[in-house]
């Protein structure tokens, strides 16, 4: 156990104090059969220069391809100022600012983040973030069950077009909560929820309805019809949305006749790098009437005894603070650092900048789909309108195509067949604002070459 502060004399003094001859004596009660012998083969440590060289050698093994993968994780341009500011010592922590008098800067930033999320979603109150989009949706389902006092069944309808990983997370979290999750089928021609399958539950006791917009396939759901159905059926409506899309699409507060009750989603597009899958953050917002059922924590603005504006942790009904059975959530912290980056990102871009990003994403994906569907053997899988990703169907094995694209330096998309067997040989592709016309042309040219080999 060599720690840098421990000099040989320090180690000898401590061993003498406990009556041991050497370090190994500290483990003499562990049978030799249980002790790992491989530690002896671990090489000696290296110096900083050698370590940097080794890191560079390992980094060179990475393949930096052109990315057309979406499926819940999106490559967006992040202004350099975002992480320059977020990495300042005053902000560089993911932990909770419990000591309000010493954390006004962090608390104000979190308060401003909540305000921005409310402006995006059109809701009245937001919490200070969740772990990621999947857990945010799972917590939204639990919140909906608590809110719906009319329901006695705890049955939750989830559209089959919700991200499959999100649905798996929901199943895991609610499994022991006496909640029944029912997955609605989707229209395999349109790529959106089959409204007829939802209509079959009219008049039945349904606790909550989960709607994704855009859905996993990038298609735009009939959110007005579905939200109005939920309202008339006394069902709590939960929207799972992409925050980038909210700069262009109708906000969830305006869906249907009365809007949704809860809005949540993945915040990664707002200034967080893809980073091999995380860390990310989730957002959740709702109406003020439901604030005491909201999970996580909420930052509020108040005044001190001198009348000066201040910020504090206003609500945090978590199992750390109250009886576990009465808590709204077991989430005990928040993704403060990622939220910091998101707040800076949204502040730098502003409403107009976010709208430009969303518009460019939409245009690039349409240009990509136009170019790809001109190739023989490639067609658009669904007819419904899409935002910034879409599903294409290939007449060749998708895994082989993906491998050949990868060999050409292109991350060609995500194959959903592992979650949807009926969608064999389809590919979910995405083109955000960072993809240039040259990138799209290269993808189309490479795919055309690959598809032409079939007849050779």
Curated annotation (Swiss-Prot):
Disulphide bridges, residue numbers: none
Domain of life: Bacteria
EC number: 1.4.4.2
GO molecular function, one term: glycine dehydrogenase (decarboxylating) activity
Keyword Transmembrane (UniProt): no
GO biological process, one term: nucleoside metabolic process
Broadest EC class assigned to this enzyme: oxidoreductase
Catalytic activity field: N(6)-[(R)-lipoyl]-L-lysyl-[glycine-cleavage complex H protein] + glycine + H(+) = N(6)-[(R)-S(8)-aminomethyldihydrolipoyl]-L-lysyl-[glycine-cleavage complex H protein] + CO2
Function recorded in the entry: The glycine cleavage system catalyzes the degradation of glycine. The P protein binds the alpha-amino group of glycine through its pyridoxal phosphate cofactor; CO(2) is released and the remaining methylamine moiety is then transferred to the lipoamide cofactor of the H protein.
PANTHER family: GLYCINE CLEAVAGE SYSTEM P-PROTEIN, GLYCINE DEHYDROGENASE (DECARBOXYLATING)
Subunit structure: The glycine cleavage system is composed of four proteins: P, T, L and H. In this organism, the P 'protein' is a heterodimer of two subunits.
Protein name: Probable glycine dehydrogenase (decarboxylating) subunit 1
């Amino acid at each position: 156990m060599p720690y840098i502060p421990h000099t040989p004399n320090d180690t000898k003094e401590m061993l003498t104090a406990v009556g041991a001859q050497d370090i190994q004596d500290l483990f003499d009660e562990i049978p030799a059969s249980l002790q790992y012998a491989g530690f002896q083969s671990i090489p000696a440590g290296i110096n900083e220069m050698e370590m940097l060289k080794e890191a560079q050698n390992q980094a060179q093994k990475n393949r930096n391809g052109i990315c057309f993968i979406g499926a819940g994780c999106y490559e967006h341009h992040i202004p350099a100022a975002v992480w320059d500011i977020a990495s300042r010592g005053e902000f560089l922590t993911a932990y909770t600012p419990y000591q309000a008098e010493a954390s006004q800067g962090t608390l104000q930033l979190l308060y401003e983040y909540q305000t921005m999320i409310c402006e995006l979603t059109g809701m009245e109150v937001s919490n200070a973030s969740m772990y990621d989009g999947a857990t945010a949706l799972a917590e939204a389902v639990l919140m909906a069950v608590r809110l719906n006092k009319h329901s006695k069944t705890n049955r939750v309808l989830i559209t089959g077009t919700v991200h499959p990983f999100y649905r798996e997370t929901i199943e895991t979290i609610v499994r022991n909560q006496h909640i029944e999750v029912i997955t609605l089928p989707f229209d395999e021609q349109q790529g959106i929820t089959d409204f007829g399958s939802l209509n079959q539950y009219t008049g039945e006791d349904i606790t909550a309805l989960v709607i994704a917009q855009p859905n996993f396939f990038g298609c735009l759901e009939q959110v007005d019809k579905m939200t109005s159905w939920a309202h008339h059926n006394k069902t709590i409506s939960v929207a799972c949305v992409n925050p980038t899309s909210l700069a262009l699409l109708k906000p969830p507060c305006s869906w249907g006749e009365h809007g949704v009750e809860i809005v949540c989603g993945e915040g990664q597009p707002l200034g967080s790098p893809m980073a091999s899958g995380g860390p990310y953050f989730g957002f959740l917002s709702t109406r003020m009437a439901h604030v005491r059922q909201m999970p996580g924590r909420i930052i509020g603005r108040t005044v001190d005894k001198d009348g000066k504006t201040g910020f504090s942790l206003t609500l945090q009904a978590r199992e750390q603070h109250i009886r576990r059975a009465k808590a709204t959530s077991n989430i005990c912290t928040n993704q403060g650092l990622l939220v910091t980056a998101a707040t800076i990102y949204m502040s730098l871009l502003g409403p107009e900048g976010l709208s430009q990003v969303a518009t460019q994403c939409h245009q690039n994906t349409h240009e990509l789909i136009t170019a790809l569907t001109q190739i023989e053997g490639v067609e658009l899988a669904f007819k419904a309108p899409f935002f910034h990703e879409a599903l294409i169907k290939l007449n060749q094995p998708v895994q082989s195509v993906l491998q050949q694209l990868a060999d050409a330096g292109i991350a060609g998309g995500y194959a959903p067949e592992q979650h949807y067997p009926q969608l064999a040989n389809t590919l979910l592709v995405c083109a955000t604002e960072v993809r240039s016309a040259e990138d799209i042309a290269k993808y189309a040219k490479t795919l055309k070459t690959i598809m032409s080999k079939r007849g050779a």
